Amino acid sequence: MFACNVYDLNDEFEANILAETADNVKRIRHHACLGLWCGNNEMEWGWRDWGRLEGHRPKYKADYTKIFEMLLPRLVKQVDDQTYYWLSSPSSGGSFDDPNDFNRGDNHYWEVWHSNKPFTEYRDFYFRFCSEFGFQSFPGKKTLDSFSLPEDQNIFSEVMESHQKNGLANTKIFSYISGYYKYPKDMESIAYISQILQLKAIQYGVEHWRRNWGRCMGSIYWQLNDCWPVASWASIDYYGRWKALHYGAKRFYARFMATACEKEELSTEIDYYIHNESFEERKAVLRVRLIDRDFHTLFETEREITAAAFEVKNVLPMDFAPFLAEAGMKKRAVAEYRLIEDGCVVSRGTTLFVKPKYFDFKTPEYRISVAEKADVFCIHADADTYVSYAELSLNGYDVVLEDNFFDITSEEGVDITVDKKEFPNQVTAEEVAAALHIRSVADSF
């Protein structure tokens, strides 16, 4: 309701605010996912640190204090005394006291994206709670086709720029692409690679802050969804189609998971962490492999892990340098981890030793099959070489898969399920197989 603005309070407007706030609090106060009520977005910070607010009348600043530090907390206590009220975001507790202080309250961080900083910049910050950060991407082909003709699908066309409301952001996306990937071959590939970058950016920040559990108690990325079909920070587009980020978020926000942390970007030294943000002790096996692009194992080890409730720890420091000494091997090698609990892989990930644009990808030959079970279709995908960020899509259907944008790191391939309820009509395994399409990074240039 209140964001990045200045309000002139009078008796009529005050009554309007109180009525609308009460209505909305009552409307959703029963939701189990409700964590807190926040008074506004970036308004306290704006008064404190944004020069453009300095010229406003002192009355407006007094009105801010009355609305968000007096009226709304009193109202929330009356209609929902079970849920905490936080004055603003970011905030250090109110009264314009350094609202974006990195050591108190919550923080918004936009140097990655708005200031073109690399993803690695996230690791220089140890916020208490990062409540806003983000990275843009284009929507997929189906959504692009909904608002543009083929001849308009150039990111600098009038149509594409009108569907981008963040200034020179299309140029910014291309700048980030150039840092990590080769030039994509067409608009569909540009959109795909932009979504991979969005996933990688947010994952880089989230996993760093999760490794510092205790100091940093959480993060919220900007943003969930869109109000129209557009290039944006959303992880779900206007039509409800999941971008790569939303599948990634399902993985990197898992309660029980592993992460890989290089000593520095592209280092051969990697620390493997276990994260248990559940209420129970967890026992698992962490398996780490170094493979080449043809799935040959160069090194393998595993470790039995016991993680107490809400424990995060470095369980396996590794240096792969001895196995990467052969000329060109860094361009062909992949470090993979799998966290296995009760015989099931619950978390997995990969690390490259060069930027993806320098990795020596081979063109994959994919094999896809579909089997039907009671309530799901089981999709099996494999390939003859390492595959990075494989995306499965179905022509003619919009479905949410169990997982997507995954790596293939062995001849065994990957098994993905899709609930039959995702399809509008009854379909057969043969029809699903005929509609399936797969692509990966190697196909994008």
Predicted features and spans:
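C-terminal accessory/binding modules appended to enzymatic or scaffolding proteins
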Residues: 361-410, 414-419
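Active-site mouth of glycoside hydrolases
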Residues: 1-84, 89, 96
